Amino acid sequence: MKLPLIIFGVGVTSGAYLLSRIVAKRHPSPFTTPVFFSTPLVILALLATGIRLEDYKPAKDVMVFLLGPATVALAVPLHKNWRTLVENALPALFGLAAGSLSTLIAAACLAKLLALSPAVVASIAIKSVTAPIAIELAPIVHGDPTLAAGFVIATGMIGVMLGPWLMNLVGIRAPLARGLALGTISHGQGTAQAIHEGELQGAVAGIAMGLAAVLTSLAGPFALSLVL
């Protein structure tokens, strides 16, 4: 019984994403970005067919497994654009450090101003790393792993929805700058959006995602000790 459910789950998810890509291409908007638009489609499909979330989990596990080869595949555009990346390494590293630290400190300060609990402050501060890293980092900074993972997912989705739109609004067209911003702030989802924009954007976003996670993991505990 599991195999048909897995095939159905993967098919529905892939179909919802492809449909969302078509809608986003014809009607570009922050609300038609594939990740945001496809999520309710999958939920509606599960509700309509009466499939429980527990039954959908094996299909989700298959797609999560495929993230591994997809991540390794980022090495291809990275290799093709290696010379450009090396030539712009210094300003890119400066921008990455500024983006990672500013989003960490700004999120923590805002959460503290709203009188949120220290656990929530710590969890929201590390929102711009990937979910697996956030889950491991949360206990170190006295945050909640479940909350941290939720904030990571929300950050990625909001970044993909609003990031390209805001960059277009303020006239940021340079592929390197766009990829750096998406990868630093919106991690995996931002990298997927960057790959959709272009090969160079995807290569830069992939590097930015990894380095931002390392920097946040190293600097996060110290920065939060100053805020909390």
Residue positions per predicted region:
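Alpha-helical membrane segments and immediately flanking helix-loop junctions
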Residues: 120-147, 151-155, 173-211
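Juxtamembrane helix-boundary/capping and inter-helix hinge elements in multi-pass membrane proteins
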Residues: 28-29, 51, 79-90, 114-119, ...
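Structural signature of hydrophobic alpha-helical transmembrane segments
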Residues: 1-13, 57-72, 117-126, 146-154, ...
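Small-residue-rich segments of transmembrane alpha-helices in multi-pass membrane proteins
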Residues: 36-48, 68-73, 94-107, 125-135, ...
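Helical membrane-embedded segments and adjacent short helical loop/helix-boundary regions
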Residues: 2-13, 17-79, 84-95, 99
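Transmembrane alpha-helices that form the ion-translocation and gating core
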Residues: 94-134, 155-172
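Juxtamembrane boundary at the C-terminal end of a transmembrane helix
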Residues: 218-228
